[in-house]
């Protein structure tokens, strides 16, 4: 069985790729260049994880997105919330809007669907999850359901997108990741890269952007040793 894993190199997509591997899928991974500030680090991380999982890795250029995106992920204007802001819906929604890239997931998953159909893969694995679904509308079960409905008309082999993490929050994802590492006898989590920034050194996280803060909290609440190096602990 063939599958495509959309792999940014982050915690969610790394765990999702391990999950697909654990289900004996022959996986290929895709990383998208949409002009993000952390692009080089994401590619290095995704390539390393792909090598560990024995998966073909592909980088797909959708750099045109930055021509109309005002997202902090493209401009570098990254919000740095406080810990107590992470569960404040209004503040989290404001942060979400600051890093929202127009139609990014729709574009990426559509291209991944074409890739999957072209190589005869039956599934696309994505790292969409419960915690990010609170504020990001394209991380919700409703998005997955409606996207799959469009694939019934947009592909001949009825490719489907699956999101094995959609009922999990970040601590649960970190815990699952550790369990999968043990099951597969592989080290993956320490090579994942969640930071919105490029901090000039491989796998080095800033520790202050929202993505880093959620990552730190995930490992802490899961009771798992955090393998991540941060500029600000």
UniProtKB/Swiss-Prot annotation:
Domain of life where this protein originates: Archaea
Disulfide bonding pattern of the chain: none
Enzyme class: ligase
Gene3D superfamilies per UniProt: HUPs
EC number of this enzyme: 6.3.4.20
InterPro entries reported in the protein's UniProt record: QueC, Rossmann-like_a/b/a_fold
Swiss-Prot/TrEMBL keywords: ATP-binding, Ligase, Metal-binding, Nucleotide-binding, Zinc
Cofactor: Zn(2+)
GO MF: ATP binding; ligase activity, forming carbon-nitrogen bonds; zinc ion binding
Cofactor note: Binds 1 zinc ion per subunit.
Swiss-Prot/TrEMBL catalytic activity: 7-carboxy-7-deazaguanine + NH4(+) + ATP = 7-cyano-7-deazaguanine + ADP + phosphate + H2O + H(+)
Residues annotated for ATP binding in this entry: 7-17
Pfam families documented for this protein: QueC
Residues the record lists as binding Zn(2+): 195, 206, 209, 212
Pathway named in the protein's UniProt entry: Purine metabolism; 7-cyano-7-deazaguanine biosynthesis
Family membership: Belongs to the QueC family.
Function (record text): Catalyzes the ATP-dependent conversion of 7-carboxy-7-deazaguanine (CDG) to 7-cyano-7-deazaguanine (preQ(0)).
The protein, known as: 7-cyano-7-deazaguanine synthase
Annotated source species: Methanococcus maripaludis (strain DSM 14266 / JCM 13030 / NBRC 101832 / S2 / LL)
